[in-house]
């Protein structure tokens, strides 16, 4: 299977500036993410950034990854990624995995899995992504945790930072276990083909995308399908705040992931 991983990353994150270079058990976060991508078996790994600081850090690693400096005007990671895919002149059918730079716990297995899912789908599916059952009521109410609702064909109906779906009677203080397969947390990784990216950047930004600050809503707004594969027993923490960074460091210090590259 031929796929390329592109990691769009900027230094001045709105919620947590500088997080890309935040230390995770002795290495910058972006390096941790890059290492997982390199372990996935991707044909190429590219870090797409508008930051010379981030570029220097990646280049100092002397790894097999590449750095592509992009424009600073992009409104989303997908827009930044699309610039790279087009500049590299990848073929229209080339599969691109969008790995977010704040996902240091996303394993190489999951990276390869999302590429494999899209590879097996018909061309009517524009994107593939992953989700896992919500683990707690606290997680469900956390607006840093993105939720997704899917239909009977496992295609996304909607993504939100709010709790969806919501039951005013059953979800007051806990999650009803009978809905465990319906209450899903989105995992921030995508796969798409280059020809889809060309369409994406031509679309206007959708109102839903602007309200939720979720770039994948542009795809649903414009009527295209996102396939969601649900996987169980996924432990993942996105680094959105200093608090979540601390939790990720705790994980690495317990050697759940850190031993891979030491």
Curated annotation (Swiss-Prot):
Record-listed E.C. numbers: 2.7.7.38
Gene Ontology BP, a term: lipopolysaccharide biosynthetic process
InterPro entries to which the protein is assigned, alphabetical: Cytidylyl_trans, KdsB, Nucleotide-diphossugar_trans
Domain of life: Bacteria
Catalytic reaction equation(s): 3-deoxy-alpha-D-manno-oct-2-ulosonate + CTP = CMP-3-deoxy-beta-D-manno-octulosonate + diphosphate
Major enzyme class: transferase
Pathway: Nucleotide-sugar biosynthesis; CMP-3-deoxy-D-manno-octulosonate biosynthesis; CMP-3-deoxy-D-manno-octulosonate from 3-deoxy-D-manno-octulosonate and CTP: step 1/1; Bacterial outer membrane biogenesis; lipopolysaccharide biosynthesis
Transferase found in the keyword field: yes
GO MF annotation: an example: 3-deoxy-manno-octulosonate cytidylyltransferase activity
GO cellular component: cytosol
Record's keyword terms, sorted: Cytoplasm, Lipopolysaccharide biosynthesis, Nucleotidyltransferase, Transferase
Cited function: Activates KDO (a required 8-carbon sugar) for incorporation into bacterial lipopolysaccharide in Gram-negative bacteria.
Protein name: 3-deoxy-manno-octulosonate cytidylyltransferase
Gene: kdsB
């Amino acid at each position: 299977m031929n796929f390329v991983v592109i990691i769009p990353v900027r230094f001045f994150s709105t919620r947590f500036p500088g997080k890309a270079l935040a230390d995770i058990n002795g290495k910058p976060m972006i390096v941790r993410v890059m290492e997982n991508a390199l372990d996935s078996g991707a044909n190429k790994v590219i870090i797409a950034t508008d930051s010379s600081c981030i570029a220097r850090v990646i280049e100092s690693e002397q790894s097999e990854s590449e750095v592509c400096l992009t424009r600073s005007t992009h409104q989303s990671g997908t827009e930044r990624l699309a610039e790279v895919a087009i500049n590299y002149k990848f073929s229209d059918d080339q599969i691109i995995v969008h790995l977010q730079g704040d996902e240091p716990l996303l394993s190489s297995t999951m990276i390869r899995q999302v590429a494999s899912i899209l590879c097996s789908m018909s061309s009517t599916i524009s994107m593939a992504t992953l989700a896992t059952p919500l683990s707690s009521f606290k997680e469900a109410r956390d607006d840093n945790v993105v939720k997704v609702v899917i239909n009977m064909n496992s295609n996304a109906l909607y993504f939100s930072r709010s709790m969806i779906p919501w039951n005013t009677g059953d979800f007051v203080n806990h999650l009803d276990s009978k809905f465990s397969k319906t209450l899903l947390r989105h995992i921030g990784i995508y796969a798409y083909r280059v020809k889809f990216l060309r369409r994406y950047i031509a679309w206007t930004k959708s109102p839903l995308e602007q309200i939720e600050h979720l770039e994948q809503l542009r795809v649903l707004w414009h009527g295209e399908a996102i396939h969601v594969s649900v996987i169980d027993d996924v432990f993942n923490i996105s680094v959105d705040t200093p608090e979540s960074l601390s939790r990720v460091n705790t994980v690495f210090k317990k050697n759940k992931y850190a031993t891979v590259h030491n």
